Amino acid sequence: MKSKIVGVIAIVLVFALDQVSKAYAIDWYSQSGATEIFKFCSLVEVWNRGISFGMFGALESSNLIFTYVSLGVILMLFVLFVQSKCNKSTICMGVVIGGALGNLADRLRFGAVYDFISLHAGEFHWPAFNFADVCVTCGVICFLCLEVMYHAKACVDTSGDPDALSVKKY
């Protein structure tokens, strides 16, 4: 139960930080335009109607399609979140859900996701992203690492028989 509370806090915190960071970036951009923060990082303004890296943004009705897809993914993740028995996985899913909700809120309010962080080195420019994208990416990576670690130690011989395996919960 405690992990569920921490997971819900993660959802709310990530969502709130994402929305605040976007509001700040929108305000900053409207006053100052694109701004180099570090030699490799700039504040920019990109309205992304597609998915990762702007893919499929030119599709007719892309916002409607991706809004429904986002809702479906968030609902699926929330079901997994509620059913999860692993504290660490619950927190990872909370971070992912919070980020996904942040981007969904943009789609519903603006018709596109607001991206404002641009990483670059010389002529190389990584596609713009936002705080929610970072949280979704980090949450998924942490969740996958936990799954790999869990499955690596999940099968334990309890009887001395190499064919007799049982699942060990951590």
Curated annotation (Swiss-Prot):
It is an enzyme of class 3 (hydrolase). One of its GO terms (molecular function) is aspartic-type endopeptidase activity. The keyword Transmembrane helix applies. GO terms for biological process: proteolysis. Belongs to the peptidase A8 family. NCBIfam families: lspA (TIGR00077), PRK14775.1 (NF011357). This is Lipoprotein signal peptidase. The lineage of its organism: Bacteria, Pseudomonadati, Pseudomonadota, Alphaproteobacteria, Rickettsiales. The gene is lspA.
